Structures are given as C-alpha cells and as structure tokens.
Amino acid sequence: MRTALTAFVGTTLALGLTAPATAEPSGGTAPSLPAFVPHPSDWSPNYTVFPYNLWQVRVTPEQVDAQRESCQWFNAQYGTLMSQIVGFQNFLGGQHDYWTAPGVQAAGDAVKANVDQSAAFLDPRAHTLYITNYPDQSQYSPLYNGDSIYHLWYQLTQISDKIAKQQPSGVINANIATANVYGNVIRDSGVCNGA
C-alpha cells in the first residue's frame, strides 16, 4: 500500500509540474531557434508591488534593460523552448531512457543547442538582475520577478547539463518542473506584458 501511494504521489507530481506542451520532437529533432535580438520598447518595470516600490531607487538603467530584454526573449521563445524540452523528455522516456535508441542523441543535441543558446542570452541579464545586498550579503532582485528570471536561467543551465550527461528523463524532469514554475510566475505576474 505504501509503495502504491508513493508511486501515485510521484506520478501526480511529475504530471502536474511539467510544462503543458508535450509534443514529441518532429522527426526526432527540434528545429533551431533563431538567435534572439532584443529591441527598444516603451516597457517599464512594475513598481507598484511591495517591496519593489521601495527598492525603485536602487534600480539601475542596466537592470531595466536586462529585464526588458529578458522579457522580450521570454515572450518570443520561452514557450517554444519549453515545448521542445518537454517533447524531448517524453521522447526519451518513450525510448525507456536509452540514449542509444535511434534518434535520441540527435534529438537531445538539438534541444540542448537551443537551451544553451537561450541560457547564453539570459546569462548576463540574469546576473544583472540578481544582486547581492549589503551589508547582509543576501541575494535579491530590486525589480519585480527579476529573481524569477535568474532562477529560470539557472534551471535551463541544469537541463542542458543533464542532457549533456545523458541523464534519464525522470532526472531531467526535476529541472523542467522547476523551470516551468518560474516560467509560470513570470507569465502569470504579467511582468513581461508589453515588453
């Protein structure tokens, strides 16, 4: 009974925390995402939420640009990237996590290339948004959900690492689920609307 309950809870968590799109990779490989190029816009950060309204004086123009550009990437490519990641995870799981099965390595390489490209774009922006507070040395973002962008970037690096190490689909799922949580926070907060 205990084993059955544990399996049920684990399955429920795995199903409930993955990204919504689950299509298998077309032809076994994901198409390359175009290199994202940010553009000027009238977007501005949300300073109405406490404590970000108090931290507004700490925000630099570089942080505003970093969040605007991260949001533009999010609006343009996050959904497609997560669909590819989940599609690959399901494809790998359907092959019983055998990386030597036909098409698995090529599909993993294609998705990893897109994840790496996205993480490379977000890396300097995420680090600009997530700063160290003095004197207590805690880390935070003075912009609303800037920390979520940082955590999303980190999860993408971990997904790439797990694909590079040919981990089983269930191991990759932990980072996919966490990336999906941060993606939902960003999307549902509306912080990127109009970027």
Predicted regions span which residues?
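Alpha-helical segments in soluble extracytoplasmic regions
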Residues: 62-141, 171-194
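Polar/charged, Q/E/K-enriched amphipathic alpha-helical segments with strong coiled-coil propensity
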Residues: 157, 161-179
